[in-house]
Amino acid sequence: MTRVLYPLVLALALIALRPAAATLEQPRRIVAVGDVHGAADAFAAILTRAGLIDAEKRWIGGRAILVQTGDMTDRGAGMREALDLLMGLENQASKAGGAVHAILGNHEVMNMVGELRDATPQIFETFGGEAAMRDAFGPKGHYGRWLRRKPMFAKIDGTVFMHAGIGPDYLKPSLDELNRNVRREIEAWDEGVRWLVREKRVTTQPEPRAAMDAARAEIERINALAEEGKATPDMGRTAQLLLPVANVGQSSLFAENGPMWFRGFSLWEEQPALQLIDQLLERHRVRRFVTGHTVQRGGTITERFPGKLFLIDTGMLGRPSFPNGRPSALVIEGETATPLYLH
């Protein structure tokens, strides 16, 4: 054994003595795109303008990084086409040495739990009906499986990308902790709904309100039995299983000030909030935040707290939902962040 180890140690020593490369790798080009909401043509157009795809919608961005900050879904009839494009580019970019990062938005989460209030008849038609769309975004569905692997935050080269923001109730956790928490909450929802379906308390892929009501009814039934001393340990475990469904409105998935819905980054007054923004940047060891969620007036990307926060939802879907909206992207190269528009 000793004679085998000596050559390895010698080889490691020789490697350690080699001089480091003299050239430093340049920062990778990052292109961030905000809320798409089914505007498939506009999404493809801004990616083309940014030099990421060709006329056939194939990746030509090389080592560039595309970040989409959530809300690909709902409202626009091209929702499925836009999702398919993003999913396809993820694989193509990886093979070319680049990357695609898809961030969860509140509308993706809504779709995953079966809340389809912002889906239109035209969207349902592209899936073959409302029931088929629910299946597609369920735990075993084509889009549901893909989305359940996606984060709420991505930290890339000194920038944190997210859909909405980080409110006062979420200042302490790390980004990894926040990402793990949202994944746990989605998994807990799925597990609770599976029980409700299996026990025939709800139909397959129920609407969220039906699942919440059924979960609460079952918990109340178990509590009543517990007061009479008739509840079994299995019933207690069932109640724990159903609590995340019954109380999903208080989870980070749907809380008004949670990371999926918070609008403070757009609404905070500049001077009072500057210290808080600086604290957040220091907490997460980054130089800037990039977020969507809140449509910016005039269809232009907004820079706040000079250079520290960029709001990139410019209402890409356009009329009638966002009359002044237009496609846009934020191009980040090292220290520089530059808005990009079609016109």
Where are these regions (language model features)?
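Bacterial N-terminal signal peptides that target proteins for export
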Residues: M1-L8
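Feature recognizes metal-dependent phosphohydrolase scaffolds
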Residues: T2, L14-H343
